Amino acid sequence: MKLDVIKLDGTKAGNIDLDEALFGLEPRADILHRVVRWQRNNAQAGTHKVLTKSEVSYSTKKIYRQKGTGGARHGSRKSPTFRHGGVYKGPTPRSHGHDLTKKFRKLGLRHALSAKAKAGELVVIENAEAEGKTAALAKQVANLGWKRALVIDGAAVNEGFARAARNIEGLDILPSMGANVYDILKRDTLVLTKAAVEALEARLK
């Protein structure tokens, strides 16, 4: 498929042939869902923790005698039946991550790129270079109509562009190796440089 290549000032800079195997697939929500779940689960801290009966700070002394009080039989105040007692089978620190094959992760990335292309939310620019001035880049981004955009560059991100983009709300930038399904789908517009297209085609073939 062919797509116009533009410069950051909005002028046309030719066109580019995009690989149908990466940008021309029929997007499948089930594949995208599985990859996003894998990403988010791996990112989850899993630090949830409650105190069990053995960890609560109370005496283990029997609170009153076994018989003759008319009350129920009780031992330690740490029992889960008491207020502020230990929690029975509560959450403990653990990893929420699970495995997903490299082949499936690549497939998910191809479907994410195809989803953006099909929705008309894919833009290819000649390069992502700037002199480091936020105001100038913010004006260009506003003129291009990018409100929530992810810019993916080649193997390395241009330092001046990264510095200029750092304080622009809704604009993220990643190198090609950092491209992932969650960040692509999270933003309204996916912006690829020509170097990013080449790197992604080499990585995902």
Curated annotation (Swiss-Prot):
Record-level GO cellular component terms? ribonucleoprotein complex; ribosome
* Annotated segments matching region Disordered: 65-99
Q: Known InterPro entries for this protein? A: Ribosomal_uL4, Ribosomal_uL4-like, Ribosomal_uL4_dom_sf
Q: Where are the transmembrane segments?
A: none
Question: Which PANTHER family does this chain map to?
Answer: 50S RIBOSOMAL PROTEIN L4, LARGE RIBOSOMAL SUBUNIT PROTEIN UL4M
Summarizing the function annotation, the protein's role is:
One of the primary rRNA binding proteins, this protein initially binds near the 5'-end of the 23S rRNA. It is important during the early stages of 50S assembly. It makes multiple contacts with different domains of the 23S rRNA in the assembled 50S subunit and ribosome.
Q: Which family does it belong to?
A: Belongs to the universal ribosomal protein uL4 family.
HAMAP family membership? Ribosomal_uL4_B (MF_01328_B)
Q: What is this protein called?
A: Large ribosomal subunit protein uL4
**Organism in which the protein naturally occurs:** Ruegeria pomeroyi (strain ATCC 700808 / DSM 15171 / DSS-3)
